[in-house]
Amino acid sequence: MNYKKYKGYETIVLEDRNWPSRKIEKAPQWCSVDLRDGNQALITPMGLKQKLRFFEYLVKMGFKTIEIGFPAASDTEYEFTRTLIEEGYIPEDVTIQVLTQSRIQIINKTFEALKGTKNAVVHLYNSTSTLQREVVFRNSKEETIELAVFGARAIKELALKNPETNFTFEYSPESFTGTEMDFAAEICNSVIDVWKPTKDKKVIINLPSTVEMATPNTYADQIEYMCRNLKSRENIIVSLHAHNDRGTGVAATELGLMAGADRVEGTLFGNGERTGNADILNLGMNLYTQGINPELDFSDINSMIEIYEESTAMNVHPRHPYAGDLVFTAFSGSHQDAIKKGMARMNKQAQYWEVPYLPLDPKDIGKSYEPIIRINSQSGKGGVSFILEQNYGLYIPKDFQKDAGRVITAYSDKMQTEIGAEEIYEVFLNEYVDIRTPLQLNYHKTQSVDSDWDLVFIEAEIEYNMQKHYVQAEGNGVVSAFCNSLKEIIGMDIDIVDYRGHSMEYGTKAKAISYIELKNETGERFYGAGTSSSVGKSSLRAVVSAINKMILAQQTKDMDTQEEDIA
């Protein structure tokens, strides 16, 4: 790769820059350019019905300025503008914005298209960059300024002839980031001299990174330079229009706001020419997650995705910030464990949202908690236990969680795929709950040996290897007594390490579930669970499940030993 064919971008000489120490404290003025900049970048541009639907959705979100197109560019663009105006699509508090070049026939057609609207921004632009001037237009700086001033005067005169509309004027030095900064300030000030903004009639100076050419801090330097050098700054709305060619359109916009800008033009999901525009969803939610009202409604992200994908035939990437299908998903075991603990803490104290790996509460944008933790071979106990707890009301003891996590991630590895909540639950049931072979409890009865029920006597009928046995024993509680009664039959000592239980929160019939952790003579741990409408029965069934796992493990070892001896 011949990297020497490229040259680095020149840095801006800006002494005592202030933007690095500033922070964004409020939402900017937003302008959606989905229907113009976004639409012109589509393989198949939107038709009239799609545009109308998209416009209505942008209004619903709270946009107060919407760039609807370039009405002089085509009959389709002109018809869309007239339809919005004549059929009453534009609310009283919403301003439509249209684009025009600095040519009199185009400006005249633009004002004709706007006839009858209450509020409109007329957006004038011409290319100012060194490359565009020298290669495309072959204009001098003076000729470039003359073109901008000509358009500014024509727009001002036509606005005076249409007093029924409240016009705002906007000027963009296209390819601003490739323009010499002193010249950018000069041409903008020449336009400002024509329009003569006031406190009540401000002018928008839009500073686009038409092609993103440098790091975001360079754009911020350029914006701060312009804010310092624009005439009548207090009557100017400085606007940003960042593209994403280097992948930093959002960052450049945020730094541009820190540098003094007041307004942002962008699109939903960053749709736009080449690699796209600055993503207003991304920008707005970045504000929201810092405790700042974005002044736009992102509460139903799924509807936004649906409208966007149907209208543009583009897909939202599964990793797209805030919106993608995998944004609120953790496969990693350590991440899952941290999320589980964070969610548990949120249930106890919730003044601020603070959950590891989740900078946003999914419910705030209409997402659910269900897909937060998803299980594959990289997952661990935290993820498995979170899903079983959230979906099925199973509060599994900590050491039991480790064993279940190992079993279920091994299953996922074997299947070579992610597994869902229902499948996780089925694996858990099959592996641990109410296991009845080779040992089965047919019936039992208990009685207290002392008045405090500390010492309990149990009689039971069990079936082991297809044979029935009647057993009895005493123990420190029902579970201990039952384990003591089985020692002679199964030929193993059994130690109870942990026993817990709770009522199940899943299903129409109330049930109890018990969890048992047992230890054999060599110190190996085994886990089982049992369910019943009776707490006592559920605990004994849990013991049977754990013992069956112990027996089956021993049988597997014995078979392995026999095979080694034969070999």
Curated annotation (Swiss-Prot):
Reactions listed under catalytic activity: 3-methyl-2-oxobutanoate + acetyl-CoA + H2O = (2S)-2-isopropylmalate + CoA + H(+)
An example Gene Ontology molecular-function term: 2-isopropylmalate synthase activity
Keywords: Amino-acid biosynthesis, Branched-chain amino acid biosynthesis, Cytoplasm, Leucine biosynthesis, Magnesium, Metal-binding, Transferase
Sequence ranges assigned to domain Pyruvate carboxyltransferase in this UniProt record: 28-302
Organism of this sequence: Acetoanaerobium sticklandii (strain ATCC 12662 / DSM 519 / JCM 1433 / CCUG 9281 / NCIMB 10654 / HF) (Clostridium sticklandii)
Protein name: 2-isopropylmalate synthase
Subunit structure: Homodimer.
Primary localisation category: cytoplasm
Cofactor: Mg(2+)
Similarity comment text for this entry: Belongs to the alpha-IPM synthase/homocitrate synthase family. LeuA type 2 subfamily.
Matches recorded under Gene3D superfamilies: 3.30.160.270, Aldolase class I
GO biological-process terms attached to the record: L-leucine biosynthetic process
EC number from the UniProt entry: 2.3.3.13
Keyword Metal-binding in record: yes
Binding site for Mg(2+): 37, 241, 243, 277
Functional pathway: Amino-acid biosynthesis; L-leucine biosynthesis; L-leucine from 3-methyl-2-oxobutanoate: step 1/4
InterPro entries for this protein: 2-isopropylmalate_synth_dimer, AIPM/Hcit_synth_CS, Aldolase_TIM, IPM_Synthase, LeuA-like_post-cat, LeuA_allosteric_dom_sf, LeuA_N_DRE-TIM, PYR_CT
HAMAP family (UniProt xref): LeuA_type2
Localization of this protein: Cytoplasm
Function summary: Catalyzes the condensation of the acetyl group of acetyl-CoA with 3-methyl-2-oxobutanoate (2-ketoisovalerate) to form 3-carboxy-3-hydroxy-4-methylpentanoate (2-isopropylmalate).
Gene name per UniProt: leuA
Region (Regulatory domain): 435-567
Lineage, highest ranks first: Bacteria, Bacillati, Bacillota, Clostridia, Peptostreptococcales
Any one cellular-component term (Gene Ontology): cytoplasm
Annotated PANTHER family: 2-ISOPROPYLMALATE SYNTHASE, PTHR46911
